[in-house]
Amino acid sequence: MSLTMADGVEAAAGRSKRQNSLLRKQLALAVRSVQWSYAIFWSSSLTQPGVLEWGEGCYNGDMKKRKKSYESHYKYGLQKSKELRKLYLSMLEGDSGTTVSTTHDNLNDDDDNCHSTSMMLSPDDLSDEEWYYLVSMSYVFSPSQCLPGRASATGETIWLCNAQYAENKLFSRSLLARSASIQTVVCFPYLGGVIELGVTELISEDHNLLRNIKSCLMEISAHQDNDDEKKMEIKISEEKHQLPLGISDEDLHYKRTISTVLNYSADRSGKNDKNIRHRQPNIVTSEPGSSFLRWKQCEQQVSGFVQKKKSQNVLRKILHDVPLMHTKRMFPSQNSGLNQDDPSDRRKENEKFSVLRTMVPTVNEVDKESILNNTIKYLQELEARVEELESCMGSVNFVERQRKTTENLNDSVLIEETSGNYDDSTKIDDNSGETEQVTVFRDKTHLRVKLKETEVVIEVRCSYRDYIVADIMETLSNLHMDAFSVRSHTLNKFLTLNLKAKFRGAAVASVGMIKRELRRVIGDLF
């Protein structure tokens, strides 16, 4: 009896392996026949009835060439699909620096011990399409959810164009498809599950194309079924000869079913034990060595929410990290400072600091830290001056101070003897005793600045000196202004200047700043 059970388990294991191998070949042949990017078989979950999860897949996209090229693209596609699956399971275990040892050989699916050449597959080596294919492995779909769920519930084929722009309710991987340039996705029911195919091109619905895909799937399935039936008949006849008396066909069917379940559960627990615990947090094994799981009916809805949340977390991490991998940049946690990666942002920042340096008169340093420190000090000084002025507004001291300031301005006059603009006064000549008329020219220095949007009107009246107009023009240029109208004249060594200018660029100086810079040029008379 023990020999019979062992033979049943071995037979079930062989059937499971052949079925997976057959399904991979079917998907590979179908996706290669139409030259699409990938094919996925979403199978029914054994732990959650009605839920679709990853069953098998075949990647046929533009794979990145690593160290060598391969003659058979078909066989290389099968091997690449296995490598991506292994990489996903390794990443799911929590190893952020995952590298998977891969093998490339004659790719005989029935014999895994053939001679091979070992290579290392890292997440850094994946293209956008390969990332799309890998992240899709983490998705599960409840009944009528997204394309696979709807195709399974309705039993109809769903053809989606412009998948990268589809709503999240219809196609939850639309954002991921946009980064991978996946434009067309097709889903149709098959063997109790759903087959999904995708391509980076925009292809309208074509019934002939669907018939071609389904015929490729059925062609391999028909040949394999004939071989399986012959092998099954031989195996059953052998088992019947080994059965002891008193065991019926129903007992044999029961034992064969149990063997199949045990083999499938053991296979999944050995390979994807951590994956199952991660994806099904509400399912707990009855004991460490058991192949069965217990579940609670009330926790199924919560489990669905956790599945969706986990998929979104994986998608968010991929979308955030993959662009940094391809551009060979450091991760944000390793960067220090602001705007180190973008030259345009750094240039704009330097321009703003240059404008800030010109606006603060006491700043002569070049480094940004000194500019900011001096700017803070200057603002504190201005704040103190404003508080002082507000405190003395309306007081007697303020009125007296204002009167003295006016007197000081009136004392800044230019007295010159001339034939016009004079006051009647007398000057006594000590030698002759005669009196003569003297012209006293009185006027005060005047400065007026009027700002309207980007145009500035400046009126200056002050004592004349050499190159004073050139100095004024240079000051305006340092303030990022260009003069377009200048009128000036000099009378009795007194300059009158009317000037109009416009600002260059977006930086606009204040009226107070313009007056302060012009006062330096005019001199102490103001």
UniProtKB/Swiss-Prot annotation:
Induction: By cold, UV, flagellin, jasmonic acid (JA), and salicylic acid (SA) treatments. One of its GO terms (molecular function) is protein dimerization activity. Residues 330-351 are annotated as: Disordered. GO terms for cellular component: nucleus. The keyword NAD does not apply. CDD domains: bHLH_AtMYC1_like (cd18918). Residues 332-341 have a biased composition (Polar residues). SUPFAM superfamilies: HLH, helix-loop-helix DNA-binding domain (SSF47459). Residues 333-382 form the bHLH domain. One of its GO terms (biological process) is regulation of biosynthetic process. Mostly expressed in developing seeds. Also detected in stems and leaves. It is found in: Nucleus. Keywords: Activator, DNA-binding, Nucleus, Transcription, Transcription regulation. Trancsription activator, when associated with MYB75/PAP1 or MYB90/PAP2. Homodimer. Interacts with MYB75/PAP1, MYB90/PAP2, MYB4, MYB5, MYB6, MYB23, MYB82, MYB113, MYB114, TT2, MYB0/GL1, and MYB66/WER. This is Transcription factor MYC1. The gene is BHLH12.
